[in-house]
Amino acid sequence: PQYVASLIQEVRRGTSKPIICYPNTGESYNPATKTWFGSPLPFRAYVRTWYEAGARVIGGCCRATPADTHDIAEFRAELIREGVPPAL
């Protein structure tokens, strides 16, 4: 999650199409032991940054939890309250 905003900004330089953001939680997978390691990073701290960087469809991939989905939905509700027509 911590690298997504800069990646979105890079993609925006090359397209005017809507950008989809579907990150994982920042953990790493060890295929030898078939285990995940590292601490998951909560989406709550990043969703607004991703949106402000240019993402218009935001979801979650590997290891994203119902709490992460809730955080995305809460941010969408904030945008609606602010009068911004979200595309999330």
Briefly describe each language-model feature range:
Residues P1-L88:
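Domain-level signal for soluble alpha/beta catalytic cores
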